[in-house]
Amino acid sequence: MANLRVLKKEIDYRLEEVVFDCDMAICFQPSKEKEIFEVMQEAVAVRNDLFAKAMNPAEPHNPSLVRKHYAALRAEMDDVFGKLFEKLSKINEKK
């Protein structure tokens, strides 16, 4: 983990990927626009939650705990955005 700026850019990048995939899904399956839009809204809420956690570590004056906090945040980010991609895939599989 290099620094907070890199982490925030990574969170934004993941959000952009989800939103782009949702836009493409809407283009190909306009009948599922409402379900896909809900995934987009959930992704934005996740981004805001992750930013709030990134900006407010539990113990900001203890470098060891800050590193652990950011490592846990990165793992949570991978997990949550992975679940959003899976949710979008399930929506796209339905006919």
Which residue ranges define each predicted feature?
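N-terminal acidic leader/helix
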Residues: L4-P30
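Low-complexity intrinsically disordered segments
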Residues: E38-Q41, A45, D49-K95
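Surface-exposed, polar/charged faces of alpha-helical domains
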Residues: C27, S31-K34, E38, A45
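Long amphipathic alpha-helical segments with strong coiled-coil/leucine-zipper propensity
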Residues: M1-R5, I91-E93
